[in-house]
Design a protein with these regions (language model features):
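Hydrophobic faces of well-ordered beta-strands that scaffold small-molecule active sites
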Residues: 76-78, 148-150, 194-196, 284, ...
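Short, flexible loop/turn elements at secondary-structure junctions
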Residues: 5, 18-22, 35, 81-84, ...
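Active-site-proximal substrate-binding groove within the catalytic cores of carbohydrate-active enzymes
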Residues: 358-445
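Substrate-binding/active-site clefts of carbohydrate-active enzymes
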Residues: 81-146, 153-279, 300-307, 323-324
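Short amphipathic alpha-helices and their capping/turn segments at secondary-structure boundaries
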Residues: 66-70, 134-144, 184, 370-375, ...
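Short alpha-helical segments and helix-capping/turn motifs at coil-helix boundaries
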Residues: 15, 61-66, 133-136, 298-300, ...
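Active-site-proximal helices and loops of the catalytic beta/alpha 8
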Residues: 181-193, 201-202, 207-218, 272-274, ...
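The feature marks proteins involved in alpha-glucan
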Residues: 2-81, 85-115, 125
Length: 445
């Protein structure tokens, strides 16, 4: 590329035109300087240095054909763990996939420790429901909330519901599809959009699809090749050994690109993606997006755009989404044909490092690099947060002045001391100030 010199304010400024590639990809660049004495230097992110030490800048070439919906990133996102938000009705767990234990007292502590067999069953429920969320919409609107992000609401055997038992049904403890439609309709009246959590890398072991314990009448993959869902899973050998998310047997992994699965989740006339958008949802958050093939995510984006171009697709990615490599593949989340934006874990990581005593320069430089790397719609449409259901509460981290509890028994009863709580609250207020003034949608959990 040829650079043309020009005089500006007593300085020589060099300009050149670079033609970006025709297709989406990442481009790295630096400047090479040839001196009058025959020497050569390079200039990059780390300043003037030798050619073998230069750190190049990144240019993200992306497709801006599909615009990011204007409603996301302009207000507060409120994350709800449905079982623990608000209980409007008393319900019964009898006959539901489980087992389940229902707490009568909303203020009881959940069971955090493993059972006698060493298993964390997540089987105690408190009965929060969709009607309870609907009843608090005025309160949420008063907080400036414009997006409700709901953790999984579909039928499942655990309280977190990331072990989907049936994508077609709302978990009965939460209500039914009519309750969901009412929630979305009432939220829309208040300028609030509802985002669902899509768990499509794995299902539950206790599900219509896998049916390991035979709870459901239909044949699941665990019943053999005669099941319509058998090809969704990889057995080696059948029936006891199978691929599972991080080896957790309760979460058998699916073959995302199996045609019948793609049709069921994405491309069928009444696919899961389309059905729940028609029921009132305005977006999907993709759980463990780095476990999903790029092709699968792109199909979801295409189906959503076809159904309603004003919908938002968010990905759970814990690193810089433009440079992320998963399973030896550089991912394409933010190149314009997959997610609209990502959960901003790099923001939380850098902010936490600063609040725990690191230099402000690290936070500034990390966020500036993210701003340079991300397409503008993705940077300003990111979901920023201090804590989620997948992280320790930031208040606890900021308040700790002694080593954190290590065992589950210790964690089950741990509380910050009064002095640690006061320290944590002071730092948390500073964190909130940064969160609510940073580009993107601040998320409250």
């Amino acid at each position: 590329m040829e650079l043309t010199p020009a005089q500006e304010d007593g300085h020589v400024v060099y300009r050149g035109i670079f033609t970006a590639p025709d297709d989406v990809e990442l481009v790295w660049y630096h400047f090479r300087l040839s001196w009058a004495d025959g020497g050569t230097s390079c200039y990059g992110k780390n300043g003037l240095c030798a050619w073998d030490a230069v750190e190049p800048w990144q240019l993200t070439v992306y497709d801006d054909t599909h615009k990011t919906p204007a409603w996301f990133g302009r207000g507060v996102t409120y994350q709800i763990f449905p079982d623990r938000f608000r209980r409007a009705k008393s319900r019964d767990v009898a006959g539901l996939v489980g087992p389940r234990t229902l707490h009568d007292n909303w203020d009881e502590l959940p069971e955090y420790r493993p059972n006698s067999e060493g298993e964390i069953t997540c089987s105690d429920f408190f009965g929060g429901d969709l009607q309870g969320i609907t009843e608090k919409l005025d309160y949420l609107a008063s907080l400036g909330v414009t997006t409700l992000y709901l953790c999984p609401i579909f039928e499942a055997s655990t309280n977190h519901r990331y072990d989907t038992a049936c994508y077609e049904r709302i978990d009965p403890l939460l209500g039914d599809e009519a309750d969901f439609r009412m929630l979305c309709a009432e939220a829309k009246k208040r300028g609030i959009y509802v985002m669902l959590d899509g768990v499509f890398n794995h299902t539950g072991r206790k599900s219509v699809y896998f049916n390991a314990d035979g709870f459901y009448d239909d044949l699941g993959a665990a019943q053999g090749e005669q099941s319509p869902y058998y090809r969704w899973y990889n057995f080696h050998p059948f029936p006891d050994e199978y691929d599972a998310w991080w080896g957790i047997k309760n979460l058998p992994a699916v073959n995302e690109l199996e045609k019948s699965y793609v049709d069921y989740i994405i491309e069928g006339d009444n696919s899961i993606i389309k059905h729940w958008l028609r029921a009132g949802a305005s977006g999907w958050r993709l759980d463990v997006a780095d476990e999903l093939p790029d092709e699968f995510i792109a199909k979801i984006r295409a189906a959503m755009n076809e159904e309603n171009p004003d919908t938002y697709l968010l990905g759970e990615v814990w690193e810089d989404g433009t440079t992320k490599i998963a399973y030896s593949q550089r991912r394409k989340y933010l190149l314009g044909r997959e997610t609209n934006g990502l959960m901003n874990y790099p923001f939380r990581t850098a902010l936490m490092a600063y609040l725990l005593g690191g230099g402000a320069e690290y936070f500034r430089d990390s966020m500036e690099e993210l701003r340079e790397n991300y397409p503008a719609p993705a940077f300003y449409g990111a979901m920023n947060f201090l804590s989620t259901h997948d992280t320790p509460r930031l208040l606890t981290i900021l308040g700790l002045t002694s080593p954190a509890p290590q065992t589950r028994d210790e964690r089950a009863v741990y509380q910050l001391s009064d002095s640690d709580l006061a320290r944590g609250m002071s730092l948390l207020k500073l964190a909130a100030l940064i969160l609510y003034t940073f580009p993107g949608s601040p998320m409250l959990y």
